Amino acid sequence: MSPQFKRLEQIYLTLFTILLALAIASCSGQDFGFLQPTPKDLCKCLPIEPDIADYRHLAKHVPIPNIVAQEVSVEIILTWSQDPVIPPDAPRTGREQEVFHIANAYLQNASVNALDCDVSMEISHTADKTAPRMIAETPVDSEYCAARQNLQAQLKQHGFVLDSQHGGELPQALPVDVVGMAFEDFEHDRGHVATLWELHPAIVTLH
């Protein structure tokens, strides 16, 4: 093996390790809230990780198109078939280009990923804490600023603090309305979450 090839191999392994570490960290990004200069203002959250470390970044950061939303439920989404592997730069295809509306779901968990600044939420079909869940995420993009602030204010009325340093499991599930685009994420530790399918981007509103 030539020295040049060996060096390239080392660089590749180093980059792969860094990207893997960032991907793992992004699943528990709230731990990095102390890095945010204005943690309480969800519209001033500054993404720390590079776009390249964010799985399917360009596919996720899009506006929700102004088309008729299809009515669906968490229960139905949990039955959708999942692809074994999707490339990290894959564009949206098929179902991912459609908008869906969940009229009745329950918000179980809400937090801000302080690395990419997305608001990540776990929702279920029933209020039961053991019910299987799916993810809904509101991106950092400026067009979602009002939606993020609205959710933050609504949760505050229920005594729950949501910002870059606070969030997590809600003491009691709250009924919500969700509208967003279907998105298939990659496999990672998801706890109660039972599918790779998400609504991302999504706007979540408490009833």
Regions found by a protein language model. Name each.
Residues M1-L8:
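N-terminal secretory signal peptides that target proteins for export/translocation
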Residues A25-S26:
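C-terminal motif of bacterial Sec signal peptides marking the signal peptidase cleavage site
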